[in-house]
A protein has these predicted regions:
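Thiamine diphosphate
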Residues: 1, 9, 16, 24-28, ...
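Ferredoxin-type iron-sulfur electron-transfer modules in oxidoreductases and energy-metabolism complexes
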Residues: 21
Length: 198
């Protein structure tokens, strides 16, 4: 559809995720059951899962918090080059991001930090809440959004990709203090196969 997560972002009590791996889905479902049924929070979930077959790795250590907040560091490529980029991907496109990191490393000597973004929407919510707090507390210590904390000590421009239109990942632009480029499936209807789409 290319835009359903953007529609979900307009509903305040909708918690939406676009996970890639089975362990991400498990963490999200467990937390969702706890919040909705045990804590009785007035929320509901919108979770997208794709119909592609691919290997699912083991869950990285200490990934749970990042999975629920919206992003976590999945992998770093290490070369002897001086150039580094931040690659953000969600859903099935994360696998394309991982492949892109390999190409950048092997063919161009560019290192990458690969981030799995389970929810651009939750990251945006956190960014907006942080912005609001800073606006209402001008004399207090300025807070930083979760995405700012993740990326502030990382080098290089940020490239964000998803299986949705560019404006989905572009929601992070105000909270990233680095050159930011978003990629998506704009023009989806013109692609006859998944290979051509990607």
């Amino acid at each position: 559809d290319g835009h359903s997560h953007l529609m979900a972002s307009n509903i305040p009590n909708c918690v939406s995720y676009d996970p890639t791996f089975a362990y991400e889905m498990a963490v999200i479902l467990r937390d969702g059951m706890k919040r909705m049924h045990e804590k009785k929070e007035n929320i509901f979930y919108y979770i997208t899962a794709m119909n592609e077959n691919y290997p699912h790795p083991a869950k990285p250590k200490d990934a749970d918090e990042g999975i629920l907040k919206g992003m976590y560091l999945l992998k770093e490529t290490k070369n002897k080059g001086n150039t580094r980029v931040q690659l953000l991907g969600s859903g099935t496109i994360l696998r394309e991001v991982i492949d892109a990191a390999e190409i950048l490393s092997k063919e161009y000597g560019i290192d990458s930090d690969i981030w799995s973004v389970t929810s651009f929407n939750e990251l945006r919510k956190d960014g907006m809440e942080t912005e609001r707090w800073n606006l209402l507390n001008p004399d207090g210590k300025k807070k930083k959004s979760y995405v700012e904390k993740c990326l502030e000590k990382r080098e290089g421009p940020v490239f964000a990709a998803s299986d949705y239109i560019r404006s989905f990942s572009d929601q992070l632009r105000p909270y990233v203090n680095k050159p930011f480029y978003s990629f998506g499936t704009d023009g989806y209807g013109r692609s006859d196969t998944r290979k051509n789409l990607r």
